[in-house]
Amino acid sequence: MAGSLFADASKRLEKALKYVAISDDAGERLKYPKTSLSVSIPVRMDDGSLKIFPGYRVRYDDTRGPGKGGVRYHPNVTMDEVQSLAFWMTFKCALLNLPFGGAKGGITLNPKELSRAELERLSRGYIEAIADFIGPDIDILAPDVYTNEMMMGWMMDQYSIIRRKISPAVVTGKPVTMGGSQGRNTATGTGAFYIMQGMLPKFDQYPENTTVAVQGFGNAGMVVAECLYQDGYKVVAISDSQGGIYNEQGIDIPAVIDYKQRHRTLAGMYCDQAICDLGENQQISNAELLALDVDVLIPAALENQITRDNADQVRARYIFEVANGPTTTAADDILASKGIYVFPDILVNAGGVTVSYFEWVQNRSGLYWSAKEVNDRLKEKMVEEAEHVWNITQELDVNVRTAAYIHALNRLSEAMDAKGTRDYYQDS
């Protein structure tokens, strides 16, 4: 637990352990990952030079089933980050009652600096390096930050080449033509929207009286913003890594999505070269967005966005974490003292892994579902588990994050106990 992010993540476990009758053995196991792999990936660049990229894969726990977790491409990827993300995946899968453990992977690079051919060589090289540690019954990959269905297709193809058989279930989030599931591309954002639909009315927050700010306008942030807009919520602010826009009257989300998809950034959306016509819109920074006086704040970017340093500036009444780990433990305490409800990442963004599970099931069975079937099953799953978590908050008088960890811990503890005491009887 040397890394700062992982040390912070583990504090959430410690808070929940006070409320769960878990054995000392089970508690001790959950403090450490099962396997942590570091690899070096050589890639021949388009100019003929050779570059080495560091890569990682962590399988945190497989008590409830094979590891499950995405692969991210980002300049800030470290073993500490990957281990923390695998830790969160363990609890996320248990919380949603999926037959998976938690895993995560990543490569340290800026993918925007590589050509498509270089990214393909990198993706295939990553699978070459970790092939003996993954598989449909061992550890299953998926998209994450700056990875997409195209890259998942390359990875599945490379694994199939290595194993000399078609193995679609080793990767989820693939193109539909390669065995991917309907609805997987939008699952994280759609699942978050279902959680909000179920939870906000408990506080008398409805579309007509609720303002929303979304930090992060990648796949998940874009989808949840559009879902909210279509349902009648007033989305007044959005941002990406380059900055954002604010409009007190509400933003035309479909128009922004169209621009973002054509230009890959929100920066300059209302500008022609150096001349900007913002109209009713104002340009704002990510820091300013987090401090807006809105009903709902949705962090949908990266981890550690709300910290001890800026939590006191947050004025939203409800936070729904679409990103992984956007709020630090110290910030949690400050937000709680202000009466702000934080709906945690392991619940809110679990739509992605839930539909990944659906894809894995479809790959294994050979039976494929329509988009309506996928979304109906997703909504049922998300709403059901959110209600379980909410009931725990009422019964034990704990915050929503602690309730989510309690719910997940109960399932993990049951699975560990069900496996028996084989460790006591192994030959020394």
Swiss-Prot record:
The active site is at 104 (proton donor). It comes from the Bacteria. One of its GO terms (biological process) is glutamate biosynthetic process. GO terms for cellular component: cytoplasm; cytosol. Substrate binds at residues 68, 92, 356. NADP(+) binds at residues 188, 219. GO terms for molecular function: glutamate dehydrogenase (NADP+) activity. SMART domains: ELFV_dehydrog. SUPFAM superfamilies: Aminoacid dehydrogenase-like, N-terminal domain (SSF53223), NAD(P)-binding Rossmann-fold domains (SSF51735). It catalyses: L-glutamate + NADP(+) + H2O = 2-oxoglutarate + NH4(+) + NADPH + H(+). InterPro entries: Aminoacid_DH-like_N_sf, Glu/Leu/Phe/Val/Trp_DH, Glu/Leu/Phe/Val/Trp_DH_C, Glu/Leu/Phe/Val/Trp_DH_dimer, Glu/Leu/Phe/Val_DH_AS, Glu_DH, NAD(P)-bd_dom_sf, NAD_bind_Glu_DH. The record marks 144 as: Important for catalysis. Its EC number is 1.4.1.4. It is an enzyme of class 1 (oxidoreductase). Keywords: NADP, Oxidoreductase. The keyword Transcription regulation does not apply. PROSITE patterns: GLFV_DEHYDROGENASE. Homohexamer. Belongs to the Glu/Leu/Phe/Val dehydrogenases family. Catalyzes the reversible oxidative deamination of glutamate to alpha-ketoglutarate and ammonia. This is NADP-specific glutamate dehydrogenase. It comes from Synechocystis sp. (strain ATCC 27184 / PCC 6803 / Kazusa).
